[in-house]
Amino acid sequence: MEEAFSFAGMAEVPFFTVLSSRPGPGTGVPTYTEQADLRFALGQGHGDFPRVVASPGTVPEAFRLAAEMLSLVWTYQAAGILLTEKHLSESRVTSELDASSVAWAEPVAHSGGEYKRYALTDDGVSPLLFPPSSESIKWSSYEHDEAGITTELAEDIAAMHDKRDRKGAALTEHLRSAQTVNHFGEDGPLILTYGSTTMSVLEALVAGDIRARVVQPVYLEPFPVWEFGDLSDEPAVVVEQSSTGQ
């Protein structure tokens, strides 16, 4: 998985995977749930390249988020991880899912002329071309020029690094208009949590008749820092199902 994820970062392959964590390390406790793979997901693959990581709290949210992330990885030709836990991925629940609420991705398509797989663009996203075509289509895991030809020239390497950085910035800007954080409650102490642990926290608050505000970041990379400006100086309880509080 590590190598494939990094390959996708360099080749700019739309790559989407589901990571469902459980207690580790090693075989661990495979029939129970845990959230110890957060750092593993955020740091997946060697090298610097844009990626998107998001974690749903409920089954309907998992459905919506999976469709949304598929659209993102195709639109931005990036690698993505839907991070969940054994608790959610193996739960049984009856939900009404609105298929009309999701849409097919519409990646930027090549419009004609000489095709450059890694064409330098303002937002870092190169147009895609699909077979059949008389044009040569190259996908390279080696650093490359615009045509996808292997290169070790410093100026080409810098240009492609800058291209990928621009793409990451465009992805982050896109998420500013998306639902990246969920808020529950209007007053009381602040609790931060993510993933399916959110529902456990809300259930515990109801059972204990406790008033609190619960903030659940849905997108973990790029992290929606713009949603946390008003909370940056406020004390909070972080409820996360890992021994180190990743």
Task: Place the predicted regions along the sequence by residue.
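Flexible, low-complexity linker and terminal segments
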Residues: 65, 70-246
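A glycine-rich, acidic short-motif signal
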Residues: 44-52
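Thiamine diphosphate
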Residues: 1-40, 52-73
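N-proximal short alpha-helices
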Residues: 35-42, 133, 137
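A broad, low-specificity signal for short, low-complexity segments enriched in glycine/proline
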Residues: 11-17, 40-45, 147-155, 202-203
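Preference for short coil/turn "hinge" residues that link or interrupt alpha-helices
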Residues: 31-34, 47, 213
